[in-house]
């Protein structure tokens, strides 16, 4: 069972927040929503499609909605991508627009929120939490 306002999918709960936050602030915000809350981790194409639809249906249209944070970012000085999501789960599904490392990952509106794009972690974007 999900909290009011959250959407259920295969045992997890999701909510799109129409607040613009940096990646770090968005992750912190998600952890404050519930004990096991984090920015969304996408583990399959099925989950990716669910999240894309949820974002498309719930995002408020502004100039800040081109991107939505997900729970993945570069963790070390060599700019390698973290080997796990912000919730600690392993990365076993990927859907990059292009294979390059900037800093933090988001979903891009142009791809109907289905492809991952590298973004500057300090930019404020909307985000989706998962518990």
UniProtKB/Swiss-Prot annotation:
<dbReference type="InterPro" id="IPR018378">
    <property type="entry name" value="C-type_lectin_CS"/>
</dbReference>
<comment type="subunit">
    <text>Heterodimer; disulfide-linked.</text>
</comment>
<feature type="domain" description="C-type lectin">
    <location>
        <begin position="9"/>
        <end position="130"/>
    </location>
</feature>
<keyword id="KW-1199">Hemostasis impairing toxin</keyword>
<dbReference type="Pfam" id="PF00059">
    <property type="entry name" value="Lectin_C"/>
</dbReference>
<dbReference type="GO" id="GO:0090729">
    <property type="term" value="F:toxin activity"/>
</dbReference>
<dbReference type="InterPro" id="IPR016186">
    <property type="entry name" value="C-type_lectin-like/link_sf"/>
</dbReference>
<dbReference type="InterPro" id="IPR016187">
    <property type="entry name" value="CTDL_fold"/>
</dbReference>
<feature type="disulfide bond">
    <location>
        <begin position="30"/>
        <end position="129"/>
    </location>
</feature>
<protein>
    <recommendedName>
        <fullName>Snaclec A8</fullName>
    </recommendedName>
</protein>
<keyword id="KW-0800">Toxin</keyword>
<keyword id="KW-1015">Disulfide bond</keyword>
<comment type="function">
    <text>Interferes with one step of hemostasis (modulation of platelet aggregation, or coagulation cascade, for example).</text>
</comment>
<comment type="similarity">
    <text>Belongs to the snaclec family.</text>
</comment>
<keyword id="KW-0964">Secreted</keyword>
<feature type="disulfide bond">
    <location>
        <begin position="2"/>
        <end position="13"/>
    </location>
</feature>
<feature type="disulfide bond">
    <location>
        <begin position="104"/>
        <end position="121"/>
    </location>
</feature>
<dbReference type="GO" id="GO:0005576">
    <property type="term" value="C:extracellular region"/>
</dbReference>
<dbReference type="InterPro" id="IPR001304">
    <property type="entry name" value="C-type_lectin-like"/>
</dbReference>
<dbReference type="InterPro" id="IPR050111">
    <property type="entry name" value="C-type_lectin/snaclec_domain"/>
</dbReference>
């Amino acid at each position: 069972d999900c909290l009011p306002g959250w959407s259920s999918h295969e045992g997890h709960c999701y909510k799109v927040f129409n607040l613009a936050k940096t990646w770090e602030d968005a992750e912190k915000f998600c952890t404050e929503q519930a004990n096991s809350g984090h920015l969304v981790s996408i583990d399959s194409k099925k989950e990716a499609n669910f999240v894309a639809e949820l974002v498309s249906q719930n995002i408020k249209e502004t100039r800040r909605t081109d991107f939505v944070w997900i729970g993945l970012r570069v963790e070390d000085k060599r700019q390698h991508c973290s080997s796990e999501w912000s919730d600690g789960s392993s990365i076993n599904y990927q859907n990059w627009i292009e294979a390059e490392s900037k800093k933090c990952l988001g979903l891009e509106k142009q791809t109907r929120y289905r492809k991952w794009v590298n973004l500057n972690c300090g930019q404020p974007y909307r985000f989706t939490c998962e518990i």
